[in-house]
Structures are given as structure tokens and as C-alpha cells.
């Protein structure tokens, strides 16, 4: 077993500036009425598959990040019989300012049969690409790395599907990261989320921009065949130059795939939206990112980490 995490551990000497409340940039589409711009309004898909996906999650006692994080795409994904499995419970030990997942002290140890239940549900849904994410578990000695490992193995052995893990940061533990990569997921994903200036404000006091980048480089050192992926939310007050610098940092650290999406405030107690980014700007950013060398880019208002993840995983 890996024992390398402690609640007070902060091994990397990377200092971020104290962040003031961001000023609203010119041209913003945030209105005083709180109404969404037209491009963020769309019909809710209706399909019997919505019920099938929901019922299977309930039958196998599984959580999805789709529901817990109030993802705007969940009905679309459910209608296509896809979902992102959320392991290690539904209570997170990190207080990220953007995330709707419950936070606090997790009530239970990892369920040893969860990998098998995920594999069975994936088989019933006929999934060809399975995405597995988790809450952050700073209370576990390995941050849940061994559980990720077991989930990937179980899914691959039962279904033959490609796999994608969207992991927490494991509090700078390279041994934990190596344990996940030993399982040979098709794609390793860890989200940058925002630019350095806003990092602690958005991701909390334990977050570390430098370690996020180092994780990506380490993955390639452990297994060069594993594809790496990261993403950022836009509309939190980042400036254009800061965003492009962050994308450049990701490419310099061997990130293959990139996602860019609009941050949407999940409730009143979360970080406010500073700006709604128009679709044409997302398109422009996609072109810039591709010119930087990203192998695949998904950029748009509704893009999220695992949205149409199979399409990205199949890209060479």
C-alpha cells in the first residue's frame, strides 16, 4: 500500500499571488438579471435511455459526477447511455469554489466491490469508453490511487472498453500517480481548471499549479503510451494572455488533449460567473490550441472534461 499523503503536506515551493476579486472585462454578457445568453439555452433531450442510465446507477449503487456536479450535459449523455462514474463516495475533502459536489469528511472507506459494480454497469450500458473520476480523498494514505487502479483493471477485463481516469492531485504523491498509470488507462486526465493568478481562489489552498503540470509530465515518464488530457473553465475572470500562457504550459508538459468550456455557477454559494464567452471565441481558441500542437481540442460553451470523451480518445 502507498503511504505518502498527509493533510499538512505542501512539498512544492510554488507561490501564487493573493487574488483580488476580478473586474468584469469589457464586452461581458453577464447581465444584472442573471439571465443566460442565448447560446447557453437549449432543449433538454428526452429519451428512454435517460431512465435506463439512471436506473442502472441506482441498481448498482453507483454515483455519477454528472448528477453530483450538476453537469449541464447530463441529460444529453444519459440519452446516449453514457455517464462518468464517480468513485470513492460522494463527499469531497476539498472546498473548490466552483464545484457542486458535497464537501466534508467522507463517511466511509472505499467500497472494495465498487470496481466490479462499475464494470457490470458499463457492460449493461454497452459502453465502449468508460470514464472514471472521483471526489478528492485527502483522508486516504494513497488518495484513492489503488482504487482507481482496480477500477480500470475491472472495466477492461469485463468489457474490453477503453478507459479514461479523471483524477484528483494526490497531494503531490508520485507513487500514487504511478499506481494509477500501472493500470494502463487509455487516457489520463487532470484538469488545470484556471490560470495561475486565480488558482487558489478557484481550486482552494491545497492546489498547486506547478504540480498539476508536473503530473502530466510524470504520466508520460511512467508510460508514454497513455494519452494525457487537461481542461480549463472560462469566465472566471481570466485574461486572454493568462489563458494562452496556461495552454502553452500544458503543451510544454506533454498534454495531448485539451478541453475548454464555460464556467456556470451551480448555486449562490459558489464563485460567480464574471463573463460568458461567446461560441466564436471558443472556436478561435480551439484554432490557437491546435496550432500549439494539441492533438485534439474540444472547445465550446457546453464542453466539459468527459463530454464526448470517446471521440477524443480515439484520435491519433
Swiss-Prot record:
Cofactor-binding details, from the entry: Binds 2 [4Fe-4S] clusters per subunit. One cluster is coordinated with 3 cysteines and an exchangeable S-adenosyl-L-methionine.
EC number(s) stated in the UniProt entry for this protein: 2.8.1.8
Entry's Gene Ontology molecular function annotations: 4 iron, 4 sulfur cluster binding; lipoate synthase activity; metal ion binding
Keyword Nucleotide-binding: no
Catalytic activity: [[Fe-S] cluster scaffold protein carrying a second [4Fe-4S](2+) cluster] + N(6)-octanoyl-L-lysyl-[protein] + 2 oxidized [2Fe-2S]-[ferredoxin] + 2 S-adenosyl-L-methionine + 4 H(+) = [[Fe-S] cluster scaffold protein] + N(6)-[(R)-dihydrolipoyl]-L-lysyl-[protein] + 4 Fe(3+) + 2 hydrogen sulfide + 2 5'-deoxyadenosine + 2 L-methionine + 2 reduced [2Fe-2S]-[ferredoxin]
GO cellular component term of the entry, any: cytoplasm
Residues binding [4Fe-4S] cluster 2: 92, 96, 99
Protein's cellular compartments: Cytoplasm
Cited InterPro entries: Aldolase_TIM, Elp3/MiaA/NifB-like_rSAM, Lipoyl_synth, rSAM
Domain Radical SAM core, residue spans: 78-295
Listed pathway(s): Protein modification; protein lipoylation via endogenous pathway; protein N(6)-(lipoyl)lysine from octanoyl-[acyl-carrier-protein]: step 2/2
Family (UniProt): Belongs to the radical SAM superfamily. Lipoyl synthase family.
Name of protein: Lipoyl synthase
Organism, scientific name: Rhodopirellula baltica (strain DSM 10527 / NCIMB 13988 / SH1)
Gene name as annotated: lipA
